[in-house]
Amino acid sequence: MRDIIDGFLRFQRDAYPARSQLFKSLATRQAPKALFIACSDSRVVPELLTQREPGELFVIRNAGNIVPGYGPQPGGVSASVEYAVAVLGVGDIVVCGHSDCGAMGAIASCACLDQLPAVAGWLHHAEAARAMNSAHEHASEAARLDALVRHNVIAQLANLRTHPCVARALEQGRLNLHGWVYDIESGRIDALDGASRRFVSLAEHPEVRAVGGEPGQAVA
């Protein structure tokens, strides 16, 4: 814990003064342009990946970058999505999976989660991804996991569309959905292209189209 406190002290001493005007402008309002939904994994840092400043991203993080489908008892993720879209008016939502995802690894390996009932219950929201992945052959366990990570991004994009605020914003043409997969070792990001319905290198195709139509029809 001491290193975390030391980090805060360095922030207060060095980083904050250098950006004091930015923080002053953010003291009473925020106007992020995008909602970024990522995994809780400590190796995935949305602001670092996108080189965004404070106030530019509205971020949701949880195990497996999961968005439960909208239901009669919406939870914290649903509330955060609704606030980002209906109140903050974000124009883009990114669902970002990543390599070596522990949540997806548990699904891919059919790990016993009897001792982790909350985790087991949470991962049921990725059942569609598991089903999609099981319908394909995989050359190795590593390939199975990589494909599952992509299928999960596709599944969570589909879940997003069940949220009334998202469906409404999409219909009105004021919201775009994006599916990304971040490779930790290489720094590469593959993005789901709305035109080809396949994942392509974001560095090689920065003009990649947002996801339209039915995300579930995409190819991992």
From Swiss-Prot:
Amino-acid positions noted as binding Zn(2+) in the UniProt annotation, renumbered to this chain: C39, D41, H98, C101
EC identifiers of the protein: 4.2.1.1
SMART domains: Pro_CA (SM00947)
KW Zinc (keyword) present: yes
GO molecular function list: carbonate dehydratase activity; zinc ion binding
Listed InterPro entries: Beta_CA_cladeB, Carbonic_anhydrase, Carbonic_anhydrase_CS, Carbonic_anhydrase_sf
Keywords attached to this entry: Lyase, Metal-binding, Zinc
Pfam families: Pro_CA
UniProt keyword annotation of Heme present: no
Catalyses which reaction(s): hydrogencarbonate + H(+) = CO2 + H2O
Cofactor(s) for this UniProt protein: Zn(2+)
GO biological process: carbon utilization; cyanate catabolic process
Record text on cofactor binding: Binds 1 zinc ion per subunit.
PANTHER family noted in UniProt: CARBONIC ANHYDRASE, CARBONIC ANHYDRASE 1
Family to which this protein belongs: Belongs to the beta-class carbonic anhydrase family.
Name of the featured protein: Carbonic anhydrase
